[in-house]
């Protein structure tokens, strides 16, 4: 009994203990839940404040991107040019090149202008004397009984032909009425005159391109050895073709001068302004095209010829105007501003054109000294013993400047403007002629000295002693062409020297040489040694169309410059 009671009390105590433990568990669970709830409330509160702080930071960042801060950043922003040093150095060199272009270009222009002046004065001074000497030889040679030699040398034959062409064309020009042409052109509208002037410029370039070919064909036909097979139409047809060409070209230049005279005498000067604006259109047609060194040389030669021709046209216009005003010196000052304006516009257009062409094509200003040396080489080589052409013809081939039509027009204008009456007038004419001869001789001496200096600076002396090349389709000429390219012994040039080669007269060649077509001696000059090796590999029996393309400055002639359009 006692055991059962004790067991029952023990069970009750266990149940009580279990209940107490449950209550403790429940109470501890409630406390945990309260703690968790309190902790969650604290976390939500902290998140709210954090979000609030982030919003405040965002508001402060937005306030930092204000207009004042942007302007401040733009004003204080820095950069470093030395990070692209090569680019900026190149740009600076381009600026320096553009600044050097006017000086170097005008050096070339002045040198080329005096070359054209030398050729132009030759027609008035030395050519009549050479023709007179040739005629004296022609008349006195049969009396001397020299039957085995030529009656006239080839150079004398060419001089006589030039003289006859000038005389015939001069008498033909008397049938052209300058006054009627002036009033006919003056009655046209401004637009018509502008179109006419542009057409005349194009026609002048075409005449210059084809005219020298006609004259060269006449000279070669008249001096070709008689033993050759007849492959031409004869000297007389060639002579009449040359006379017709010089006459038509002279009329063309007369129309140009008349149009310019009408522009000078217009009341509002609108035509003169339009004609001057035509020069600036030339910038558009030339600047934005690809140019190489040879193309720029062609354009430079064309600009020299154009400038000399324009100056001569201005002289003709001034003579005609002074004649109309009875040689009143006050009227000369009326023409002076217009003349200066035309000259200034011509110089400005040339400078701007060449400056931007060299800039866009990465050509240095030193290239103009090479062009000047090439022109000087022609002058020096024409004074050698083995010279194959007269210098006037060389300038005509190089620049496209043919002096005969322009000289013929100037003679026509001067003889119609100046009346020679009495012995005093004849004395004045003789003194003026002696003055022109003096000017021609002094100009030739100075040009020859300068040319020798330029050739020496360019290291082109050795090219002066090389024989002129030749080319012909036959095998004989091909063999002769190969022998021409062989180098001469080094002792021969040393014995003669440059000074002797430019002062002695050409020696007489055999009357029956191998069939050859004379070409420019300057074709021998090469700017790079690689070109000489390439040129030696060309087949000698190839025709003109199979020749290698021209790469050298001395090979550039008027065949490609008269159009003045380089694609």
UniProtKB/Swiss-Prot annotation:
GO terms for cellular component: centrosome; ciliary basal body; endoplasmic reticulum membrane. Signal peptide: none annotated. InterPro entries: Tatp1. Pfam families: DUF747. Residues 468-477 have a biased composition (Low complexity). Keywords: Cell projection, Chondrogenesis, Cilium, Cilium biogenesis/degradation, Cytoplasm, Cytoskeleton, Developmental protein, Differentiation, Membrane, Osteogenesis, Transmembrane, Transmembrane helix. The keyword Mitochondrion does not apply. Residues 1-23, 465-543 are annotated as: Disordered. It is found in: Cytoplasm, Cytoskeleton, Microtubule organizing center, Centrosome; Cytoplasm, Cytoskeleton, Cilium basal body; Membrane. One of its GO terms (biological process) is ossification. Plays a role in primary cilia formation. Involved in cartilage and bone development. May play a role in the differentiation of cranial neural crest cells. May act as a downstream effector of hoxc8 during development. Belongs to the TAPT1 family. This is Transmembrane anterior posterior transformation protein 1 homolog. The lineage of its organism: Eukaryota, Metazoa, Chordata, Craniata, Vertebrata.
């Amino acid at each position: 009994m006692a055991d059962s009671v004790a067991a029952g009390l023990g069970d009750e105590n266990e149940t009580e203990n279990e209940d107490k433990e449950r209550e403790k568990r429940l109470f501890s669970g409630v406390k945990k839940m309260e703690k968790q709830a309190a902790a969650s409330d604290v976390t939500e509160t902290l998140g709210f404040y954090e979000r609030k702080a982030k919003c405040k930071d965002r508001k402060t960042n937005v306030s930092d991107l204000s207009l004042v801060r942007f302007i401040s950043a733009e004003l204080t922003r820095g950069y470093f040019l030395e990070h692209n040093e090569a680019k900026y150095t190149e740009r600076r060199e381009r600026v320096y090149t553009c600044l050097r272009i006017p000086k170097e270009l005008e050096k070339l222009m002045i040198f080329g202008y005096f070359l054209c002046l030398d050729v132009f004065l030759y027609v008035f001074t030395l050519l009549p004397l050479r023709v007179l000497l040739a005629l004296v030889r022609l008349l006195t040679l049969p009396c001397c009984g020299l039957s085995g030699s030529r009656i006239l040398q080839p150079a004398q034959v060419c001089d006589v032909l030039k003289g006859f062409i000038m005389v015939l064309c001069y008498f033909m020009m008397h049938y052209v009425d300058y006054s009627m042409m002036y009033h006919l052109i003056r009655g046209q509208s401004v637009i018509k005159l502008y179109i006419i002037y542009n057409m005349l410029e194009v026609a002048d370039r075409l005449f210059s391109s084809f005219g020298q070919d006609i004259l060269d064909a006449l000279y070669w036909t008249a001096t070709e050895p008689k033993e050759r097979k007849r492959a031409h139409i004869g000297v007389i047809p060639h002579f009449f073709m040359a006379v017709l060409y010089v006459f038509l070209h002279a009329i063309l230049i007369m129309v140009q001068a008349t149009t310019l005279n009408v522009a000078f005498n217009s009341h509002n000067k609108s035509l003169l302004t339009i004609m001057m604006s035509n020069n600036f259109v030339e910038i558009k047609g030339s600047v934005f095209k690809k140019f190489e060194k040879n193309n720029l040389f062609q354009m430079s030669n064309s600009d020299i010829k154009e400038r000399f021709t324009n100056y001569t046209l201005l002289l003709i216009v001034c003579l005609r105007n002074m004649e109309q005003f009875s040689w009143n010196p006050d009227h000369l000052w009326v023409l002076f501003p217009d003349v200066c304006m035309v000259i200034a516009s011509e110089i400005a257009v040339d400078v701007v054109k060449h400056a931007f062409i060299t800039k866009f094509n990465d050509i240095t200003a030193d290239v103009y000294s090479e062009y000047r040396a090439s022109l000087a080489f022609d002058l020096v080589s024409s004074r050698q013993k083995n010279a194959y052409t007269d210098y006037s013809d060389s300038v005509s081939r190089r620049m496209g400047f043919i002096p005969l039509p322009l000289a013929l027009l100037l003679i026509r204008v001067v003889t119609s403007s100046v009346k020679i009456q009495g012995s005093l007038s004849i004395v004045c004419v003789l003194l003026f002629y002696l003055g022109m001869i003096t000017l021609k001789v002094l100009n030739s001496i100075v040009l020859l000295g300068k040319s020798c200096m330029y050739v020496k600076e360019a290291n082109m002396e050795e090219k002066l002693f090389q024989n002129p090349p030749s080319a012909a389709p036959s095998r004989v000429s091909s063999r002769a062409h190969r022998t021409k390219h062989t180098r001469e012994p080094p002792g021969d040039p040393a014995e003669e020297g440059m000074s002797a080669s430019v002062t002695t007269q050409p020696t007489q060649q055999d009357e029956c040489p191998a069939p050859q077509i004379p070409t420019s001696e300057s074709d021998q000059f090469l700017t790079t040694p690689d070109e000489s090796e390439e040129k030696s590999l060309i087949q000698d029996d190839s025709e003109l169309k199979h020749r290698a393309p021209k790469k050298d400055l001395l090979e550039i002639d008027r065949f490609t410059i008269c159009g003045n359009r380089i694609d």
